[in-house]
Regions:
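Glycine-aromatic micro-motifs
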Residues: 1-154
Length: 154
């Protein structure tokens, strides 16, 4: 079993578990809050549609923090996520990171995805941002409030 760190639309448990993993018979284990230090959340991943839309990405930045969800799953879950994240098409790449667990403060190795197809002046759609906001149960209130304030394309 591995830890997968979600900071974007996969923070929505229904999207990750029901729409992505379960349909490929991958059972997800515990889902807890996580903190990735030294990275910043940005919306610069070129989304498939509409024009000008962004998906979430993370970039290294000393002193910054990204909050998200740590999701326990079998390694086969990453193969499923590779398809959804467009790894073969060069959209995202897997990245090994160290994430601090929200429940006990322990730092654990995890896998996340970093965008490769990026652009400037992009914004998330409200529909996309709603997936991030669905992680509210495991996000610090101030981080969730910051997410809600993000400018959207529509």
């Amino acid at each position: 079993m591995i830890w997968y760190f979600a900071y974007g639309s996969n923070m929505n448990p229904a999207r990750l578990s029901d729409q992505r993993l379960k349909e490929r018979a991958v059972q997800m284990g515990p889902r807890i809050g996580g903190r990735l230090d030294g990275w910043r959340l940005v919306f610069n991943k070129v989304a498939r549609q509409p024009a000008g839309a962004a998906a979430a990405n993370i970039v290294e930045m000393p002193g910054a923090v990204v909050h998200g969800t740590l999701n326990r799953m079998p390694e086969a879950g990453l193969d499923v996520l590779d398809i959804w994240e467009g790894v073969a098409g060069g959209h995202y790449a897997r990245r090994d990171v160290a994430v601090t667990r929200g429940d006990n403060g322990e730092t654990v190795p995890a896998v996340t995805y970093v965008a490769l197809k990026v652009g400037e002046g992009l914004k998330p759609t409200r529909e996309y941002l709603a997936h991030l906001l669905a992680g509210e149960d495991l996000l610090p209130p101030d981080y969730h409030a910051w997410l809600k304030m993000q400018a959207c394309l529509d």
